[in-house]
Amino acid sequence: MNYFAHLTLAQPTAASKVGNLLGDFMRGVDEASLPPPVRLGLRNHRLVDRFTDMHPRVRESRRLFSPQRRRFAGVALDVVFDHFLIRHWSRFYTESLDSVITRDYALLRQGEIFMTEPMRHTTERLVTLDIFRRYQELDQLGEVLDRIAGRIRFANRFEGSIEDIRAHYGELEQVFLAVYPQLRRVVRGASVERGR
């Protein structure tokens, strides 16, 4: 799961939202120095990643990506799973998607004091470009994935992974629809951030 799913599975506080994204920005961060609510959010982030990455259906779905892109299939799956969460939002939640996105953007801005500089830069871009609303469109996902490919520090053939997603869209969607309800139950059951 990528940023939007992590935010969705967080508590509705700035510290929790930041902690639930911080797992992707931990370079140089002393975890012990984080405020407890941020640290709990970070633990929740790790639970979500561990469950998703180890799920047999997710692992098996990596084979749907061409051999030259398979090494980065996990990244592509995280992003496309956010797309599916947005696309199927009303299947899982009663609150409107628009109000959740607006609130999450506001909470991320409130939580800037807890962020590393790279995280602050990324979240500013997320909010300013309204990335989550753009995730509804496959063409936008392709642009996001190609930008990620451009940031990888070594030669790779990850660019164009949207073509693998298009070719196996229905299969990937079914994987998401099977895995996400299980993930929600795991997060609630673990109660990493009390009150789940």
For each predicted feature, which ranges?
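N-terminal leader/auxiliary helical segments
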Residues: M1-R43, L47-R196
